[in-house]
């Protein structure tokens, strides 16, 4: 009888520990999620930089198109595997022409976003990549007001002014070091605008795919496969690919496919990090990751930067971090007294409408 009671007690303790994980288990989950986000995000930027600048293939749109192809394949494959074997959960991926047409306006913005992101990375160094696209927050505020009619607090606008100052200082100091590419800066500004528009239009069309971000990812990339074809033709990339001397090189295709896998995984690890922490912590992690990425790039490429160049990076990072903090306070104030379900919904909308980090880093 005593042994039976001890067994029941042990079973109860095991069930309670499973339902209420210890602090250490929670810490492990957070550390693993944040580490995965950093590894895939930083790895994707360096890998794309290599593909865009070091393999002697002048076809940035083709590289982006292929990564979209990998994403579509992975979405369909995981959906079929999930349905057939039930080893994990992944949403169904029905290919519907009606849904594809409804998502098309967003897909046009999506194609512009991933194209300008990669074109910016092609012409600027990894160390300047974050500053080069740092106006996303500013465009997000402007577009939210012009398109949705939503006003932003004076404190948030002050943070945007700080970001603009840091961006201009960064451009100036990049010129001082002799590594400034005006083409790259222009593509960076256009990428920032596209990311802001992408976040807004994502909210508008999300209901068309049943509020499923994975399904939206599949349709966006599926539409992109078609939209990229005339762009590649106009840019003369079919000939560049056909005459590429490493076209049948296994290593090249492994790296290309790995870039697509990393881009796909960014969607998962971003959601995982948010789930393990919070939208605010996710944004702070993204800002810290950008700082680490900048330092790593300077060391990896043996670059020499001025004190003012580093100051520009700090100003942009500080402005972005303060903007996140200010917006979080605004959301907390709005959510005070609201139900937990309403708070969760607000956090989701805030995530979609913020800087679009997930989207811009997934390419």
Swiss-Prot record:
Residues 334-363 are annotated as: Disordered. Residues 344-353 have a biased composition (Basic and acidic residues). GO terms for molecular function: antiporter activity; GDP-fucose transmembrane transporter activity. It is found in: Golgi apparatus membrane. It is a multi-pass membrane protein. It holds the Pfam family TPT. GO terms for biological process: GDP-fucose import into Golgi lumen. InterPro entries: Sugar_P_trans_dom, TPT_transporter. Keywords: Golgi apparatus, Membrane, Sugar transport, Transmembrane, Transmembrane helix, Transport. The chain crosses the membrane at residues 30-47, 62-79, 126-148, 152-171, 180-202, 222-244, 251-273, 307-326. GO terms for cellular component: Golgi apparatus; Golgi membrane. Belongs to the TPT transporter family. SLC35C subfamily. Involved in GDP-fucose import from the cytoplasm into the Golgi lumen. This is GDP-fucose transporter. It comes from Caenorhabditis elegans.
